[in-house]
Regions:
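Sec/Tat signal peptide C-region and signal peptidase I cleavage site
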Residues: 19-25
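Bacterial N-terminal signal peptides that target proteins for export
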Residues: 1-11
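Secondary-structure end/capping motifs
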Residues: 220-296
Length: 321
């Protein structure tokens, strides 16, 4: 291009004669998240502009629990959702969702076992009513805790609930005697002086992770969008690890948990996208339990599709051959 042509083009642009370049079309992606911190990377990716950078129009719906967020995939209310390992693994067998990546490791201590004051050791739980958030990771933690501490689940009465606040209210009213709780539920369930924290989820001896999954149909129809989402979440993971205080501000502005609670909860998670031996070991432990309880075999090989993360963040896939 000659200098005179460039100058003429610049003059036309300055005078408004050249049409503005159209913005790149964004792909709409419907996300399902819980009301606490499992969706941390999604909120950060939205607020920091990482989705925009990757051409994603994020449409985020908050559900009471991760279970509901995952179920939204199965009924067509979400394209991608995040959740902890147990509810994710227990819903794979229908083939309607693909697990794409681990999004964080859960370090011990997130769930606290709150019990009535008359319960002093695990054996005291026999004959008691124990609340669970049915189908969640807390459900599995409860069962594994009992088994690890010599208490058969058959020796207690399991009472199912659909939300943390239901569990808290039932503890305080005496409807149940014990339950693993989390987030602000710990303080709310012990402030009456009639309950205390006996232990935390480390006593269940599980390797916990959270995952992001996509509806199988969406992943097959829009694989580029799935890869773009994973790239955005990888950026968000790095931001959270380096800026926990600011991340807590962002996450709390979108969730039901107070800012200080969110900041504390972030300390129980190591945020990074990954598919490696850690994720596989944790997945296998959950799938063994699911296969036993549902009489349906669930495996890492059939439930996880590493191809999307391999394209998005190759270094994040470290599975042994």
């Amino acid at each position: 291009m000659t200098k005179s042509v460039r100058m003429f083009g610049g003059l036309l642009a300055a005078c408004g004669f050249l049409a503005a370049q159209p913005a790149l079309a964004e792909t709409a992606v419907r996300f399902g998240v819980d009301a606490y911190t499992t969706g941390s990377q999604i909120w950060v990716a939205e607020d920091k502009g990482y989705f925009d950078e990757e051409g994603i129009d994020a449409q985020i719906t908050t559900f009471a629990t991760g279970v509901e967020a995952i179920d939204a995939l199965l009924v067509g209310r979400a394209d991608m959702s995040v959740g902890l390992d147990f509810p994710m693994v227990s819903r794979i067998q229908g083939g309607k969702l693909k697990v794409l990546a681990g999004i964080f490791h859960s370090t011990p201590g997130f769930h606290k076992l709150v019990v009535s004051n008359d319960i002093q050791e695990p054996s005291d739980l026999k004959g008691k009513k124990i609340g669970i958030a049915t189908g969640t990771a807390e459900h599995l933690i409860t069962i594994k805790y009992l088994e690890e501490n010599g208490v058969s689940p058959d020796d207690v009465e399991i009472v199912g609930f659909t939300s943390l606040m239901e569990i808290v209210a039932s503890l305080r009213s005496g409807r149940i005697d014990a339950s693993f709780v989390w987030a602000d539920g710990t303080e709310k369930s012990t402030s009456d002086g009639e309950h205390y924290v006996l232990t935390d989820d480390s006593a269940a001896k599980l390797k916990g992770s959270a995952y992001i999954a996509a509806a199988s149909g969406f992943a097959e129809e829009k694989p580029e969008a799935v890869v773009s989402v994973l790239r955005a979440l990888d950026k968000a993971s790095s931001f959270i690890e380096a800026n926990r205080d600011e991340a807590a501000d962002i996450i709390a502005s979108h969730t039901r948990a107070p800012r200080d609670t969110v900041r504390n909860l972030l300390e129980y998670n190591a945020f990074s996208l990954a598919l490696g031996d850690y994720e596989k070991a944790g997945f296998d432990a959950v799938s063994e339990f699911v296969s036993r309880s549902q009489s349906t075999e669930v495996t890492f090989a059939t439930g996880v599709d590493a191809s999307f993360l391999t394209e998005a963040v190759p270094s994040a896939v470290t599975l042994a051959e």
